[in-house]
Amino acid sequence: MLGAKKQKAWLSDQEFAKKFGLSVVDTTDNRYELLAIPFDGTIPRFAQNVKKQRIQGEELTIYYDLQCPYVCQNIEIIKEYCTINDVPLSLIQVDTLQKAKELPCVFNNYSVFYKGNFQTVNLLDIAYVKRILKK
């Protein structure tokens, strides 16, 4: 189960899970936590590419899949804004198991990076894009 040191609205309450025996078995540099019950003694871990939540590219980069019905519309809005304003943009659709395993973050449905740094898992609007680009 994915949790966080500080509770996030989109994550299940890990305190509830801990009451049923789950415990923190791994963490990322950004304070996300992996909770599990190691039934057979093996302990799951975050992949190393997830730990730092960083990428090589400097451009605005969005990893996304189509689990949420609003993602397609959101991607088109961001793509149009970036095209009009000459903002370099990389869009990476996570549409295979291999791509999901290679993600640089704990979220496979939507994550945003800028200047190599993880920014958010929230769908972007234009105002949010402008705030990110000012960083």
Language model features by range: what are they?
Residues K6-L34:
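Conserved active-site alpha-helix within GNAT-family acetyltransferase domains
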Residues M1:
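Conserved acyl-CoA
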Residues Q48-I84:
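Local sequence-structure signature of Cys/Sec-based thiol-disulfide redox active-site neighborhoods
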Residues L89-N108:
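Thioredoxin-like thiol-disulfide oxidoreductase module
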Residues L11-S12, C72-E76, L124:
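Generic recognition of short, well-ordered alpha-helical segments
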Residues D29-K52:
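C-terminal "cap" of GNAT-fold acetyltransferases
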Residues P104-F113, L124:
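Structural micro-motif
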Residues Y114-K135:
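Non-catalytic, surface beta->alpha helical segment in thiol-disulfide oxidoreductase systems
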